[in-house]
Amino acid sequence: MKVRASVKPICKDCKIIKRHQIVRVICKTQKHKQRQG
């Protein structure tokens, strides 16, 4: 899980979702998991 100021999809499997005012990237590649904060 990376915590970043700007979250961007890295590959075509990355999905941006908003969960309780937190922007997240979920992906089947575990390295691509990100959270804004």
Swiss-Prot record:
Keyword Ribonucleoprotein: yes
GO cellular component: cytoplasm; ribonucleoprotein complex; ribosome
TM region positions: none
A Pfam family assignment: Ribosomal_L36
GO MF term (any one): structural constituent of ribosome
Keywords: Ribonucleoprotein, Ribosomal protein
GO BP terms: translation
Domain of life of the native organism: Bacteria
Family membership noted in the UniProt record: Belongs to the bacterial ribosomal protein bL36 family.
PANTHER family: 50S RIBOSOMAL PROTEIN L36, CHLOROPLASTIC, LARGE RIBOSOMAL SUBUNIT PROTEIN BL36C
Name of protein: Large ribosomal subunit protein bL36
Protein's organism: Mycoplasma pneumoniae (strain ATCC 29342 / M129 / Subtype 1) (Mycoplasmoides pneumoniae)
Gene: rpmJ
